[in-house]
Amino acid sequence: MKLTVLTAAVVLFAAGFVGPGVGMAAAQEQRATERDASDDASDRWRRWRNYNRYPGPIPTPEEWGAPAGPIRIGLQAGHWRAAEAPRELRRLRYNGTQWQGTAEWEANLAIAELAGAQLEALGYEVDILPAVVPPGYRAHLFIAIHADGSDSPAASGYRVASPRRDATGRAEDAARLLRDTYGAATGLRNLPVQTRRMQNYYAFNYRRYEHALHPMTIALIIETGFITSAHDRRVILDAPQRAARGIVEAVKAFPITALPRR
């Protein structure tokens, strides 16, 4: 009997059995390692959150002033020329939606060019911008033009958002106008939910990216409709002039970009 117990003990020891004291020490060491990893992750998150490449200080809304010169409007065709994105924005090279061979950027560019032509005819200076904006881009108003996509063909409607961190203090006023004028021009449904991705749009993020707007550029982003929705495609693909008109009317109505009456 004693021989049997001894043999079992030897087998357990040879197989790597450890007593309760050793096991507890290993568990404590594991927990300490996990805490260190968690602390490292928290430190990385704090550094990322507080990172600021803008050569500050960041202006306040009270310090806002319009750019010198004629009223300039920047219209960004979302995802257009995204393959040219620099390393800091390399993820742009691989996103964007499509519908049966029509890429999102094609719809965005068509709307941007139509709106730009109408605005230039009214006397505005207009820049049609690709996915990557010039560093520190300055304009009276910047509008990023995009289209949504969904696995559900029932998803329909448009969204407008202003930056979560708006140094101008004026972007949400412009966003409200665009929600109204775009809906009136297109007949599409306004979706009141603004996604975090829209509010934290990379072109707004001058703290993190070199290729971002100047903090004093009033900025908006519009998802003009769902390219995956037959209802919305009647506007954004089949009648982009209606989408363009909705954008133009907002520019005209916004007090900062309204042309003086002749």
Where are these regions (language model features)?
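Catalytic-site microenvironment of enzymes
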Residues: 2-262
